[in-house]
Amino acid sequence: MSWWQVISLAVVQGLTEFLPVSSSGHLAVVSRVFFSDDAGASFTAVTQLGTEAAVLVYFARDIVRILRAWFDGLVVKSHRNADYRLGWYVIIGTIPICVLGLLFKDEIRSGVRNLWVVATALVVFSGVIALAEYLGRQSRHVEQLTWRDGLVVGVAQTLALVPGVSRSGSTISAGLFLGLDRELAARFGFLLAIPAVFASGLFSLPDAFHPVTEGMSATGPQLLVATLIAFVVGLAAVSWFLRFLLRHSMYWFVGYRVVVGVVVLILLATGTVAAT
């Protein structure tokens, strides 16, 4: 990979990881349209370490508070508060994607990164997001979360294994369907992603160096720079997105997804861009 490719894709990763537009889908599209080859699932997973580090920084106080409450609750039963329970919900919600990610890792690295799949997912799942916005009551708050909410949102997170769906899009939509307010759905989804994304990034790190494995290859320095860029851009993106959700719905992103998906489908149908 050239440095221009690395920097461009890292910026795309940082900008799109937390928005309901699918970072992996955008990386696949940008790679094929502008650089004629897919960066690969491993490059995506490794650069996601940068954006998840941004989540750690942004939610540092929340994470420390939840961890303290969780460990404290394990020792003293009377100290089991909402933060203690939230820690368990994150653990419960992480299980589905870890299991499916391991079972279908080969398919994730190859077949589902086909641009026909990506473009179709962008369009189809935009309908799910719109429906969640329309039906969501947004009346439940963090004190009302249950383990079932953690499991449902965790199952929804597995949909993000398909490029074009979007991790934040699937988890926020699930939260809205469950009646959570929009900001809580986003925050819970971002916290839920931390264990799975870090595990995926570390697991994929060796593969990202080898062109024989998939897509384009990157050197160690390139991966480091890409991860740092994704961190900086991602930190700005998550801060902006959560402020955005306080006053706006996700309908803006629904329209964007449909436009991008349709454009990619046209490019594929006319043979302008190769699907794989």
Curated annotation (Swiss-Prot):
Residues annotated as transmembrane: 84-104, 115-135, 188-208, 222-242, 250-270
Entry GO CC: plasma membrane
Enzyme Commission numbers on file: 3.6.1.27
Membrane topology: Multi-pass membrane protein
Keywords from the UniProt entry: Antibiotic resistance, Cell membrane, Cell shape, Cell wall biogenesis/degradation, Hydrolase, Membrane, Peptidoglycan synthesis, Transmembrane, Transmembrane helix
Localization terms from the record: Cell membrane
Pfam families (alphabetical): BacA
Family per similarity comment: Belongs to the UppP family.
PANTHER family assigned to the protein according to its UniProt record, in alphabetical order: UNDECAPRENYL-DIPHOSPHATASE
Other comments on record: Bacitracin is thought to be involved in the inhibition of peptidoglycan synthesis by sequestering undecaprenyl diphosphate, thereby reducing the pool of lipid carrier available.
Family matches, as NCBIfam families: PRK00281.2-1 (NF001392), undec_PP_bacA (TIGR00753)
Role played: Catalyzes the dephosphorylation of undecaprenyl diphosphate (UPP). Confers resistance to bacitracin.
Name of protein: Undecaprenyl-diphosphatase
